[in-house]
């Protein structure tokens, strides 16, 4: 639902000029690494103390060692941050519109905020309040990444996508 709402909001105010193709190839690595980060983060949360349903003395958890899966999660985040920094550098170097550069910086800022919360919760015994803030931050980061992805995406018309133009056809958005 968050992705659908973000796409709908972004498409409603689209600039009719698509970004140059030299910037488009960054959108999928960033989006893919973000998805991998969220999945790995879900595994970390599902393996930790604030997971599953509580039934007396039994708490259902995923069978992963928290330090190991947290390292996997952190490694994916580091790769994502490096790709975002590279993208921002490329956007600055090629004179991309300020809005695209700003959204790239927004993604980077949200990732840095998330990393700070994640490390703090890991080294302070995973307090439940920080887990909640980290999940909220993951949602904000996902929205920022989708917004940035859409900025770097071609228009549906440029792809030859005419679906949704007629009233009897379903409207399908192209990410």
What are these model-derived regions, one by one?
Residues 1-175:
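Polytopic transmembrane helical bundles with strong interfacial aromatic enrichment
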